[in-house]
Amino acid sequence: MYNAPPPQDMSYYDHCQRRHEEKGCLYACIFTALCCFCCYETCECCLDCLCCCCN
């Protein structure tokens, strides 16, 4: 079988910030909102990213 992937060093917030830097504010906000939609909950990290992605 396949081995488990290696642990990732980037946090969710860092990932959203990278998306903001690479693709812009709108993409980062949509990316963050879709994360909450996929996990069916609104977590504090998602709210922080939505509030801060345009700063």
UniProtKB/Swiss-Prot annotation:
It is found in: Cell membrane; Secreted, Cell wall. The chain crosses the membrane at residues 24-40. GO terms for biological process: cellular detoxification; detoxification of cadmium ion; detoxification of copper ion. Pfam families: CYSTM (PF12734). It is a single-pass membrane protein. It comes from the Eukaryota. GO terms for cellular component: extracellular region; plant-type cell wall; plasma membrane. The keyword Metal-binding applies. Keywords: Cell membrane, Cell wall, Membrane, Metal-binding, Secreted, Stress response, Transmembrane, Transmembrane helix. Its main location: membrane. One of its GO terms (molecular function) is metal ion sequestering activity. Belongs to the CYSTM1 family. Confers resistance to heavy metal ions (e.g. cadmium (CdCl(2)) and copper (CuCl(2))) by chelating them at the plasma membrane of root cells, thus stopping their entry and reducing their accumulation. This is Protein CADMIUM TOLERANCE 1. It comes from Echinochloa crus-galli subsp. caudata. The lineage of its organism: Eukaryota, Viridiplantae, Streptophyta, Embryophyta, Tracheophyta.
